[in-house]
Amino acid sequence: EAGIIYLTDSPSDIEKKFKRAVTDSDNSVSYDRERKPGVSNLLDILSVATNTPVAALAENYSQYGKLKTDTGAAVAAMLEPIRTRYEQLKGDPGELSRLLRIGAERAQGVAATTLDRAYRAIGLAPR
C-alpha cells in the first residue's frame, strides 16, 4: 500500500507516501537511472506532475526530503480534480448511471465497427 497512490487518496495520504519513498544510499540529488533509481524515479514523477524537465529539477534539489515533499505535493495537486470529481459522482448515483450509459453506448459503437472490420478481414459476412 505504501508504494501505491490511489486516485481516491487524500492529499495528505499522498504526501505521506512520498515522504516514505525509498531513495538511494548517498545524499546527493542527481538523475542516474542505473546508480540512483530511487531519486531518478522521484524526479521522473515530479517532472510529469509539474511539466518541468528532469535536468532542471535535479539542479534545484540538494536534499531528498525536499524532493519527496515537493513530489508528493505536486502529485496531490495533479490528482485533486480527479479526486474531487470522483467524490461528486459518488454522491450522485443518478449522474453516475447516466455517464455509464453514455460510455457504454460509445463503447458499443466502437466495438461494433471493430468487430465488423474483423469479420470482413477473415472473410465472414458482416453482422
Regions found by a protein language model. Give the residues of each.
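Conserved nucleotide- and phosphate/pyrophosphate-binding catalytic cores
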Residues: 1-127
